[in-house]
């Protein structure tokens, strides 16, 4: 008696076996591209303010695009400020002015931690970042702690990593945003019930 043909059962429509990762022709898996975002910082601040509250992925995308937009506005305003004063760099003390111009009126009054001052024994931020991906200032310009290197020829502001870190250290602003987002979410949830 001939044996019946054995077929593998077809995967169900919604099963995970049917969905496979995209592969190249030679059989290697594609690497996932890395995307930088502020989502981990927003999440940390949210958990510090409201430990029992979570955030949706779409809301995190909104917060991420908001922070990118604010950061670009501050960089552009800092570039204009340096151009008006005929300077190639701005110090950490002068970086509060662009923040006051770009942010809402209530933000500059909230307490903001000052940038740490560099002692002679600690290296400058451009010297302390090892690796090929580290950005450093041109050798003709002195490195500034929490400063901003702005090319005079263009209005594009190239911020050093110390400015980015000091921007992320302003947790009072992020806490304010996280609490506003939580209040909006609570109000939105109560409307639809």
Curated annotation (Swiss-Prot):
Residues annotated with Phosphoserine modification: 15, 37
N6-glutaryllysine sites (modified residues): 17, 35, 44, 47
Bias (Low complexity): 1-12
Residues with PTM N6-methyllysine: 47
Residues recorded with modification N-acetylproline: 2
Primary localization: nucleus
Residues found modified as N6,N6-dimethyllysine: 58
UniProt crosslink position (Glycyl lysine isopeptide (Lys-Gly) (interchain with G-Cter in SUMO2)): 6, 21
Domain of life per record: Eukaryota
Residues where N6-(beta-hydroxybutyryl)lysine is found: 6, 12, 17, 21, 35, 86
GO terms under cellular component: nucleosome; nucleus
Residues the record lists as N6-(2-hydroxyisobutyryl)lysine modifications: 6, 13, 21, 24-25, 35, 44, 47, 58, 86
Post-translational modification: Phosphorylation at Ser-37 (H2BS36ph) by AMPK in response to stress promotes transcription. Phosphorylated on Ser-15 (H2BS14ph) by STK4/MST1 during apoptosis; which facilitates apoptotic chromatin condensation. Also phosphorylated on Ser-15 in response to DNA double strand breaks (DSBs), and in correlation with somatic hypermutation and immunoglobulin class-switch recombination. Crotonylation (Kcr) is specifically present in male germ cells and marks testis-specific genes in post-meiotic cells, including X-linked genes that escape sex chromosome inactivation in haploid cells. Crotonylation marks active promoters and enhancers and confers resistance to transcriptional repressors. It is also associated with post-meiotically activated genes on autosomes.
The UniProt record lists the keyword Oxidoreductase: no
Region Disordered, residue ranges: 1-33, 111-136
Cross-link Glycyl lysine isopeptide (Lys-Gly) (interchain with G-Cter in ubiquitin): residue positions: 35
Assembly notes: The nucleosome is a histone octamer containing two molecules each of H2A, H2B, H3 and H4 assembled in one H3-H4 heterotetramer and two H2A-H2B heterodimers. The octamer wraps approximately 147 bp of DNA.
Family listed: Belongs to the histone H2B family.
UniProt xrefs under PANTHER family: HISTONE H2B
Note: The mouse orthologous protein seems not to exist.
Record-given protein name: Putative histone H2B type 2-C
Taxonomic path: Eukaryota, Metazoa, Chordata, Craniata, Vertebrata
Encoding gene per record: H2BC20P
């Amino acid at each position: 008696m001939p044996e019946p043909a054995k077929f593998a059962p077809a995967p169900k429509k919604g099963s995970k076996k049917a969905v496979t990762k995209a592969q190249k022709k030679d059989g290697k898996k594609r690497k996932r591209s890395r995307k930088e975002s502020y989502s981990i910082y927003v999440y940390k601040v949210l958990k510090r303010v409201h430990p029992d509250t979570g955030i949706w992925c779409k809301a995190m995308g909104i917060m991420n695009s908001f922070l990118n937009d604010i950061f670009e506005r501050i960089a552009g305003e800092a570039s204009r400020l340096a151009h008006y004063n005929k300077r190639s760099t701005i110090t950490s003390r002068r970086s509060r002015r662009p923040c006051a111009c770009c942010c809402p009126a209530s933000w500059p009054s909230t307490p903001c931690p000052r940038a740490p001052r560099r002692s002679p024994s600690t290296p400058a931020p451009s010297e302390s970042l090892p690796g090929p991906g580290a950005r450093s200032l041109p050798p003709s310009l002195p490195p500034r702690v929490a400063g901003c290197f702005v090319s005079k020829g263009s209005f594009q502001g190239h911020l050093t990593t110390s400015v980015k870190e000091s921007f992320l250290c302003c947790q009072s602003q992020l806490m304010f945003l996280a609490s506003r987002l939580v209040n909006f979410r609570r109000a939105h949830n109560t409307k639809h019930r």
